C-alpha cells in the first residue's frame, strides 16, 4: 500500500484476528495497536474514540495513511479484493463470501457460549456439529472437484474464506479441543492452513489473549 497501516483493537483475538491472519498470510507489515480491556487501561480506548474520526466509535479500526476503515467484515472484504484472495471469478467470489457469512453465523453462537455462557449444551450438541457438517460438505465438494493435496474451500487457491474457517475453529478449539474429531476434511484443512509458513510463524509468535 505504501502508507503506514495501523490496526486498532482490544488486547484480544476477537473481531480483529481474521484481519491479522490476512496480513500474516500476505506478509504485510502493520502496527497492531491493542487497547487494554480492564480498569485504567480502558481509558486509552475512550480517548482514542474522541481523537479519531471513527464512524461508529467501535473497533476494529484499520487506518491506512489518512484513511479510516471500520467494521471487521467490511475490512476483511476490502483487503481480500485488494490483494486478490476473494476468488478467481465472479462466482467464486460469491462462494467465498457465502462461506464467510456462514462462519459469522456459527462464530456468533460460539461467542454467546464462550463469552456470555449461553446455551453451551445446545451449541455443542446441535449448532457445532450441524455447521461443521455444512463446512465439511462444502470442502469435500471442492476438494473432490480439484483432486489435489491442497485443501481450499473455493477454487484452486486460498481465499479469505479459508482463513475465516481456520480462524473459527482455531478459536473454538481453544475451549473445545476435540471439536473436529468427526470431520476429517475440516481437520485436514485446519492443519493445512496452520502449516502455511507465514501463518505458522504468526501463530507460533502470537500473543496470548483473554478471548
From Swiss-Prot:
Q: Sorted alphabetically, which InterPro entries does this protein's record hold?
A: Glutathione-S-Trfase_C-like, Glutathione-S-Trfase_C_sf, Glutathione_S-Trfase, Glutathione_S-Trfase_N, GST_C, GST_superfamily, Thioredoxin-like_sf
Q: What is its EC number?
A: 2.5.1.18
PROSITE patterns tied to this protein? GST_CTER (PS50405), GST_NTER (PS50404)
Question: How is activity affected by pH?
Answer: Optimum pH is 8.1.
Q: Where is the GST C-terminal domain?
A: 89-211
What activates or inhibits this protein?
Answer: Inhibited by chloroquine, cibacron blue, ferriprotoporphyrin IX (hemin) and S-hexylglutathione.
Q: Where is the GST N-terminal domain?
A: 3-87
- Domain of life, per the record? Eukaryota
UniProt entry tagged with the keyword Ribonucleoprotein: no
An example GO biological process term is: glutathione metabolic process
Q: What is the effect of changing residue 9 to F?
A: Greater than 10-fold decrease in activity
Q: Mutating residue 211 to F: effect?
A: 2-fold increase in activity
Q: Which SUPFAM superfamilies match?
A: GST C-terminal domain-like (SSF47616), Thioredoxin-like (SSF52833)
Relate the outcome reported for changing residue 15 to E: 10-fold decrease in substrate affinity and 20-fold decrease in activity
Which family is this protein grouped under? Belongs to the GST superfamily.
Q: What does this protein do?
A: Conjugation of reduced glutathione to a wide number of exogenous and endogenous hydrophobic electrophiles. May also function as a storage protein or ligandin for parasitotoxic ferriprotoporphyrin IX (hemin).
Q: What is this protein called?
A: Glutathione S-transferase
Amino acid at each position: 500500500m505504501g502508507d503506514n497501516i495501523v490496526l486498532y483493537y482490544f488486547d484480544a483475538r476477537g473481531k480483529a484476528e481474521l484481519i491479522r491472519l490476512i496480513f500474516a498470510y500476505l506478509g504485510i507489515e502493520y502496527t497492531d495497536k491493542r487497547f487494554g480491556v480492564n480498569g485504567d487501561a480502558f481509558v486509552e480506548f475512550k480517548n482514542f474514540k474522541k481523537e479519531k474520526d471513527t464512524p461508529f466509535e467501535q473497533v476494529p479500526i484499520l487506518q491506512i495513511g489518512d484513511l479510516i476503515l471500520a467494521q471487521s467484515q467490511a475490512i476483511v472484504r476490502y483487503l481480500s479484493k485488494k490483494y486478490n484472495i476473494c476468488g478467481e471469478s465472479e462466482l467464486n467470489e460469491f462462494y467465498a463470501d457465502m462461506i464467510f457469512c456462514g462462519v459469522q453465523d456459527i462464530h456468533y453462537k460460539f461467542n454467546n457460549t464462550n463469552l456470555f455462557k449461553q446455551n453451551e449444551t445446545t451449541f455443542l450438541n446441535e449448532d457445532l456439529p450441524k455447521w461443521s457438517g455444512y463446512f465439511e460438505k462444502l470442502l469435500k465438494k471442492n476438494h473432490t472437484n480439484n483432486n489435489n493435496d491442497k485443501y481450499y474451500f473455493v477454487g484452486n487457491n486460498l481465499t479469505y474464506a479459508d482463513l475465516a474457517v481456520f480462524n473459527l475453529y482455531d478459536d473454538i478449539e481453544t475451549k473445545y479441543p476435540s471439536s473436529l474429531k468427526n470431520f476429517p476434511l475440516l481437520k485436514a484443512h485446519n492443519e493445512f492452513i496452520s502449516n502455511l509458513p507465514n501463518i505458522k510463524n504468526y501463530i507460533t509468535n502470537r500473543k496470548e489473549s483473554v478471548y
